[in-house]
Amino acid sequence: LQNRRQKLAIDLNLIPYYGIPWEEEKPYIIRSRAKEGTSSFYAYATVYVISQGKRVTLALHAVRREETLVCVITRLLDQIANLHISIKRLYLDRGFYCVPVIRWLQACDIPFEMPVIVRGKQGGTRALVQRKRTYKTSYTMHSQLYGSVTFQVWVIGTYDMGRRGKHGLKYLAFVVYKVSLGIRALPVDYRKRFVIESSYRLKNLCRIHTTTKNPVTRLLYVGIAFLLVNLWVFIIWTYVSKPRKGGRQLFQALFPLRTMLQFLRQAVERRIGVKTEIYLPEEVSF
């Protein structure tokens, strides 16, 4: 990965939180749209590399409630600075669509792709997708708090083809900065970002579920989960594959993540033993 231009993706992963937080937890509990019976969450930001079909998490950051999105991105990129990775393209989801983030990415000269949030009934960004054609244009977004920023928008018509039960033509709008790509290739390219969501699902298979009130312990458990997923990717590419013309042939179905976790569990049990009995308390006489 070092000294090469890489495609990176940044995203936020929300883990539901229930109950009343202790004082040491409060800085890490954020509020978001209700999900799984709660609107309180621990939030973890990750940066993910997509290289030669390999998907690996490079950095993890526990988000504080008062942190801005620009601060979150900065902390993640600082963590991987010693890898000397040049960013070929940065993928972000619509949660990062705001004036400060776009202005900061442009100021840092970082190439990126990000969906536009469509708002308004006729004007605003709604008007961008109502022209019913594929095109490029510039757009200025205004914020009462942060001022304004002008950026390039690409609007592309795509067919749903039955995905999620939807059919027909729809138009997508993206913020694009210094991306060397044909306009019609953009939706397919951006879809690569969704591998980060699959990494979250894999991470959940490995994550230690806990009720601890210690934010550091929670971060440790999430970090271990991502490391286990990275280990699995390494094993697949190194030992569960064969070289061939056009790229390595992977046999991922022969060694799913669950199997690796079972192997690890068996190794731990052989090392420290397993509990096979319990003892009832002795009767206490008064």
Which stretches of residues belong to each language-model region?
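Short, solvent-exposed helix-loop connector elements
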Residues: V179-D189, N204-V222, Y239-P243
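Active-site-proximal, Lys/Arg-enriched surface segment
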Residues: L1-S51
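A short, flexible helix-boundary coil/loop motif
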Residues: Q130-T158, L205, L228-F286
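Domain-level cores of phosphate- or acyl-group-handling catalytic modules
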Residues: E66-G124
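Intrinsically disordered or highly flexible coil/loop and linker segments, enriched in small
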Residues: S86, V195-Y200, T212, V233-V240, ...
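Short, conserved catalytic/metal-binding motifs centered on acidic residues
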Residues: R4-Y18, V47, I87-Y97, F112, ...
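Electropositive, glycine- and tryptophan-enriched low-complexity nucleic-acid-binding patches
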Residues: I30-S86, K170-L172
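An anionic, glycine-rich sequence signature occurring as long contiguous blocks
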Residues: C108-L205
